[in-house]
Amino acid sequence: MATPRVHVKKGDTVMVITGKDAGKKGKVLSVEPARGRVVVEGVNIVKRHTRPTQKMPQGGIIEKEAPVASSNVMLFCNKCNRPTRIGRQILADGTKTRVCKKCGEVID
């Protein structure tokens, strides 16, 4: 089975469009292309119960971000100030870049 194409990169600002965190904006912390999932800052917070270890002698309940499906996030265009679809464009010097479909702003 083919792996899904992930349309966002680490460091992009995205908005969640579906689910319990719909409407929240955040920065992409990591991308898992094999699973088609992304971890977004401040989105899909889960609680993990951890035992005390030498690295973390306190233990306890830790809150951290869990991955969300990449299909549930859209890249956020700062010029349009809204989530947008992206297109790919090859510039005159031959470099590939991502472009906002609404306003034509170069994202990369």
UniProtKB/Swiss-Prot annotation:
MF (Gene Ontology): rRNA binding; structural constituent of ribosome
UniProt cross-references to NCBIfam families, sorted A to Z: rplX_bact
Protein name: Large ribosomal subunit protein uL24
Ribonucleoprotein as UniProt keyword: yes
PANTHER family per record: MITOCHONDRIAL RIBOSOMAL PROTEIN L24
Organism annotation: Moorella thermoacetica (strain ATCC 39073 / JCM 9320)
Keywords: Ribonucleoprotein, Ribosomal protein, RNA-binding, rRNA-binding
Complexes and interactors: Part of the 50S ribosomal subunit.
UniProt keyword Ribonucleoprotein, yes or no: yes
Record's function text: One of two assembly initiator proteins, it binds directly to the 5'-end of the 23S rRNA, where it nucleates assembly of the 50S subunit.
Classification via SUPFAM superfamilies: Translation proteins SH3-like domain
Single GO biological process annotation from the record: translation
HAMAP family reported for this sequence: Ribosomal_uL24_B (MF_01326_B)
Highest taxon of the lineage: Bacteria
Family membership noted in the UniProt record: Belongs to the universal ribosomal protein uL24 family.
Listed CDD domains: KOW_RPL26
Gene (UniProt): rplX
Pfam families according to UniProt: KOW, ribosomal_L24
Cystine bridges: none
GO cellular component: ribonucleoprotein complex; ribosome
Signal sequence bounds: none
